[in-house]
């Protein structure tokens, strides 16, 4: 028996703001990620491979704030963070501030499996990723017009200077100010200043748990800001001993302070069910001002989704049950 759950970020997602076309595009993106991870698990593959496959699919989809759809820093750059954790032996890997590695989740896994370390950042992380053969791209690979316009809007609102358009970016479209066609992708209504992230948690047929998370961070971030995603125990955690794997999405500073992912696994280790543990932790992080959501996988394959936002892009699949995806908080997505 295997089980998989994914998320594509939590935040202010209202039906009135999401056109039928965009709704369908997000659901298709979630389904594609579920299909990628499920294919690994259905053929007896590992939870780690499934998590990586699902996350990489979302990293390549400009709809999501990870990899190709990453938001921009105040300086007009894309800085990518990711983490992965193996529940069997609690090994973990994380990267922060990547600018050229196509799949940050692959870099995080390489840190875990091919280095003596847990977290690498910036130029060193980039050099390491290249040295182990991970695909490198020009920074402009991550450019999307909608994220760029979101940055300019945020900087104007804050009264901050606007950076030059990045080298290698396509020329500014003449259609600006008009409705952007779906083909040009993301003018997402999600409040990406806090909530854009992708993640996956899995249980494989051998009972192994794993978790992985990837993000572009928050729009207009400054000073090398890093959120909860690559912080093991905050945005990402997995432990077979605790019977739990977690990937979070939300206001990263609060999720770090509340050690959200580790706390959920601490709760399940005492016998609490995954849904109760997730709900209790979201209530706790909410009590200090944090917004967002989590996906949790139990050792029996039970899936929990919990959020204190109006939506979270999410989905789940498992052996012997149909896959399903959901967007809004009031939609049923778990069993």
Regions found by a protein language model. Give the residues of each.
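Alpha/propeptide regions of enzymes that mature by internal proteolysis
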Residues: 1-335
């Amino acid at each position: 028996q295997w089980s998989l759950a994914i998320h594509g970020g939590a935040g202010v997602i209202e039906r009135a703001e999401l056109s039928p076309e965009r709704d369908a595009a997000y659901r298709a993106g979630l389904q594609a990620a579920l299909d990628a991870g499920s294919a690994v698990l259905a053929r007896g593959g590992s939870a780690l491979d499934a998590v990586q496959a699902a996350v990489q699919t979302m990293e390549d989809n400009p709809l999501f704030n990870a990899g190709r759809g990453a938001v921009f820093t105040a300086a007009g750059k894309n800085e990518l963070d990711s983490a992965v954790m193996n529940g069997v032996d609690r090994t973990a890997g994380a990267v922060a501030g990547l600018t050229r590695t196509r799949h940050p989740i692959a870099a995080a896994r390489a840190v875990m499996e091919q280095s003596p370390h847990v977290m690498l950042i910036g130029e060193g992380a980039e050099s390491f990723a290249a040295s182990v053969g991970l695909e490198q791209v020009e920074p402009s690979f991550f450019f999307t017009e909608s994220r760029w316009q979101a940055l300019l809007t945020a900087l104007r609102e804050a009264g901050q200077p606007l950076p030059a358009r990045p080298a290698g970016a396509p020329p500014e479209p003449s259609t600006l100010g008009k409705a952007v066609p779906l083909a040009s992708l993301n003018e997402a209504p999600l409040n990406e200043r806090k909530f854009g992230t992708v993640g996956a948690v899995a249980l494989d047929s051998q009972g192994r748990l794993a978790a992985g998370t990837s993000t572009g961070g928050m729009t207009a971030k400054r000073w090398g800001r890093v959120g909860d995603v690559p912080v093991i125990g905050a945005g990402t955690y997995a432990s077979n001993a605790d019977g739990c794997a977690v990937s979070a999405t939300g206001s990263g500073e609060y999720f770090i302070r509340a050690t959200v992912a580790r706390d959920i696994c601490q709760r399940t280790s005492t016998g609490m069910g995954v849904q109760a543990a997730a709900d209790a932790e979201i209530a706790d992080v909410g009590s200090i001002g944090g917004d967002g959501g989590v996906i949790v996988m139990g050792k029996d394959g039970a899936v929990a989704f919990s959020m204190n936002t109006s939506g979270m892009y999410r989905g789940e699949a498992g052996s012997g049950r149909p896959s399903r995806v959901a967007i809004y908080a009031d939609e049923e997505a778990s069993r």
